[in-house]
Amino acid sequence: ALTAVHMACEQLRQGRCEMAMAGGVTVMITPDGFIGFSQAGMLSPDGRCAAFAASANGFVRGEGAGIVLLKPLTQALADGNPIHGVILGSSLNQDGHTNGISLPCPEAQARLVVDACADAGIDPVKIGYVEAHGTGTAVGDPIEATALSHALCGDRSPEAPLPMGSVKSNLGHLETAAGVVGLIKGLLVLKYGQIPASLHFDAPSEHIDFAALKLRVPTAMESFPKTDGQRMVGVNS
């Protein structure tokens, strides 16, 4: 879904269209996906997505849909449209050669986030919250945490670690719709200035050194970090 959002933004910036709808949908109408993922040992046996937690034991499938309507900011303002947020920049890349779909490349992930920040023209330290991919797997979560830290936390104070969460702990992994659901959650965080808890985070994963990475996972609703400018969130997928 975020690939569609990225491509829509590119078309809008190039003047190829005046507005665009982008998103994704997942409907589980056959058991095939469950069978395949189960045979691969990828699904959580207890049906709970415990992203970045010690109890992370696999991902949880979910179904749903999400769509956003995109327009250039100047045109949306001129038309008097309600504006839920502004996409400052985005990027798209490929994982490259890895040992499998459940073992993503940390270097590629970090480069993607760095490129997105560069496209947005922002200092990564200005990001007050990141909505992570956070599938709840014991191997994938530490890889993503490392990548996000390398991309966003190099100049961040250890006393102010970056909050991150995963909507998959609420809804499961919506697969082709997962990215846009994370984007919508990020927009709601901006709108209300509140960061919700990431569920099922009873204890941090022993494979993630949160202090060293300068990251943290909120376990209760909290206010968005104070900023001297506009609120900014990042979405990784």
Model-predicted segments: where are they?
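Condensing-enzyme catalytic core of the thiolase-fold
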Residues: 1-237
